[in-house]
Amino acid sequence: MPCAQAVDELGRFMEANSRPVDTVYVFGFSSGAYVKAGRTSASRFFWSRPVIVGFNDGRPGYGVTGLLDDLRRSTPAIVALQQRDWYPDVDDSAHFFMSTPSLAGWLRDGYQLARGPEGFDVWIKRALPQ
């Protein structure tokens, strides 16, 4: 589970590396980072567990497909994948996201890995070609 310092550091990172009008996304258990950053979540899934365990998977708007629809619609400036948040109970968020082909493909196509706070794999939206 995240410590308060990690959530605070992630929030400060998101605030410094995005604009107030941007959405950001944390796939994990650190939704306090949105408040610290003053940013809106790019998805209704403000924590990862429902997606990881497959809550209502197969129903429109839920599961991996529902999350991916939200992310495509909102195009967050920053995506943070939390490490070691749910393990060993279920797969941790970063590993789950990157092991799911549709999510990993979406992320790699539009984002680049950046150096961010410890405990998170942080991805920044790539600049559009001029």
Question: Can you annotate each of these PLM segments?
Answer:
Residues 1-129:
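Extracytoplasmic
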